Amino acid sequence: MKKVLALILALCMAFALAVPAYAADDEEVSGPLVLYSSMTEFDLEALETCFNEVYPDVEIEVVSGSVGEYTSRIAAEADNPQGDVTWGGLCDSDGMTHEALFEKWVSIHNDEAMEGYSTPNGFYSMDHLSTVCFCVNTELEEELGLDIRSYEDLLNPALKGKIVISDPNSSSAAWNNLCNIFSVYGVGTDESWDYISKLLENMVVVEKSSVCFNSVYDGEYVVGLTYEDGAIKLNQNGSTTTEVRYPTEGTSAAAYGMAIVKNCPHRAAAEALVNFMTSAEGQTAIAEYEEGTLRLTNANYVVPEGAWLEASADMTWVPRPVNELIERKAELLEHWNELVGQIQG
């Protein structure tokens, strides 16, 4: 990582000199910026480093938390907003759920997004994709004599209490995983609920999405139902005991975005940050910094050589019925909660 840092910073500097301003009306941007985020520390480091090469006078304060935590906070602060912008957690399957919290504004680069990944609602600016995966502790897997590749493999009795997922009521990563199960087995079908019921017999539900890969690395669980950009960073940081695997039945991705808090105190800086993160230049800089551990949305960004994530062309994908999932989200979560109560008490 360190050996490429100088090159990456030089790249960011080059963008600072070569690309047009990202702020509204090309105004000079400086001062504080409060970012509510569910992204990993490394994602935040990448964004802050590359953005500050373009806007060195913006001081970013990060408030970390799940999407449920920070949307509740924004709602509570509505009469006196403290935050400016969000990153992570807000996904295309939210529909208009959070309409009251955010400005009706999207990035100037919205039209540059890959097909299907422009704004879904007029206030999210989509910047990255999060693909459903398993994070597997290969040492524990070997001890159990298993080869975990599919959803059906997760039902093995040897995995009882050894699979972890976060709470889909507050974690977008967990909802993303449920959406993929529904994409494979049918949205709200008897087959899907039968599978989920059996899976809950083996699974532990936790609050924070990062637990679903960090605790697998720590050896607390064998499998985490999680997202690739979080899990792959374990390998990037030297893990030899965890692997990112995609269910053989097929995987799918949710598009995640940024949004500007309604009546935020630092609007110009917020717009500059969103415009930077959704631009081809900004995404290329982020991708270089992160060594290709995040799938991004701008059709023109450059994927770095030797990227950590598996190439999309080599993966098995399943279509995701996004609109149906949006329409039925409340109903599906209600049934999920009922099953959790019945099976796990």
Which residues does each PLM region occupy?
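Periplasmic-binding protein-like
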Residues: 112, 130, 195-199, 205-206, ...
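Hydrophobic residues within well-ordered alpha-helices
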Residues: 74, 215-219, 260
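Extracytoplasmic ligand-binding site segments that recognize negatively charged/polar headgroups
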Residues: 34-45, 65-68, 82-220
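Conserved C-terminal helix/tail region of periplasmic/extracytoplasmic solute-binding proteins
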Residues: 316-345
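Mature extracytoplasmic/periplasmic domains
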Residues: 252, 256, 261-320
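A ligand-binding cleft/hinge motif common to bilobed small-molecule-binding domains
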Residues: 92-97, 217, 222-241
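Short, low-complexity disordered leader/linker segments with a strong preference
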Residues: 1-32, 344-345
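Conserved N-terminal structural module of periplasmic/extracytoplasmic solute-binding proteins
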Residues: 24-85
